[in-house]
Amino acid sequence: MTRVEELLSQIKNLKTEKNAIILGHNYMEYSVQLVSDFTGDSYDLAVKAMKTNAKIILFAGVYFMAEQASALNPNKKVLSPDPNAGCTLSDSLDVKTLQEYKEKYPNAPVVLYINTSIYAKALADYIVTSSTAVKVVQKLNADTILFGPDANLANYVQQKVPNKKIIKVPPNGRCIVHANYTKQLVELARKKYPNALLMAHPEAPLEILESADFVGSTNQMIQFSKENKNEEFIVATEIGMINALKIKNPSKKFYPLVTTEACACARCPYMNMINLEKVKRSLEEEVYEVKVPEDIAERVKRAFENTMKLL
């Protein structure tokens, strides 16, 4: 038995013993996705967390995702295998900056991407994902909207909803992975894989999205590649997504826009901090518990409910 097989077996036993479930983000490494009870994007997993009867929820993803699960599930124990697994997007917007924008634009609703710290989310009117951002903004009864922290997603929403003024909060919030994508990389990938369709995440720069055959969230990419007759796809998002796509569509071929050999930017260093050893320890010792203050959790839940009413 290999070490990976041993860990998978031990984690499976721990889940039963502790009445725990593992929620694994689509960007997780292959072995972590295998041991997860549910895989998906951050919103999908937050909803799954609300529906589970498990006593313990282990979130195999970056820290803001565990915060989100805790806010929506105050009576359950939520664990993060590594509390240092941060997010450049989440870190790019602090409460002070958001409050300054709210004071400057008092009548503008605040729409925050789910990749935001829980304390900033507590000041939001709506919390969206890459798959719901356009739909929510379209339905808002406001001409000016504060949108953050992802500037690329804000640009995409602005393009899709030109009749509204999107103010980026902050002006330069970026994902460390998607920020490095260029049109030149797209041209090289298309030349290398001429029969492949390009799928891009809305966190990518607008020039990448305009070159893509499909733009969508990680879950939407899985669905698109499953339903599309094409057999090959170039994937313009974090390289761990290739694992999720191969698990769900084993007969098709998926190529990352950029490989880890070509650029360190292909892999999110924070997502990469979560591995089987840490997952096992987290379940075994029930660390590290993520607990969101009650008043913050209530405000975040209210913003989520506001969003759900529009979808």
From Swiss-Prot:
GO BP of this protein: 'de novo' NAD biosynthetic process from L-aspartate
Pathway: Cofactor biosynthesis; NAD(+) biosynthesis; quinolinate from iminoaspartate: step 1/1
Pfam families: NadA
Superkingdom classification of source: Archaea
Catalytic reaction(s) noted: iminosuccinate + dihydroxyacetone phosphate = quinolinate + phosphate + 2 H2O + H(+)
This protein's UniProt keywords: 4Fe-4S, Cytoplasm, Iron, Iron-sulfur, Metal-binding, Pyridine nucleotide biosynthesis, Transferase
Residues annotated as binding [4Fe-4S] cluster: C87, C175, C268
Function according to Swiss-Prot or TrEMBL: Catalyzes the condensation of iminoaspartate with dihydroxyacetone phosphate to form quinolinate.
HAMAP family: NadA_type2
Name assigned to this protein: Quinolinate synthase
Species this chain originates from: Saccharolobus solfataricus (strain ATCC 35092 / DSM 1617 / JCM 11322 / P2)
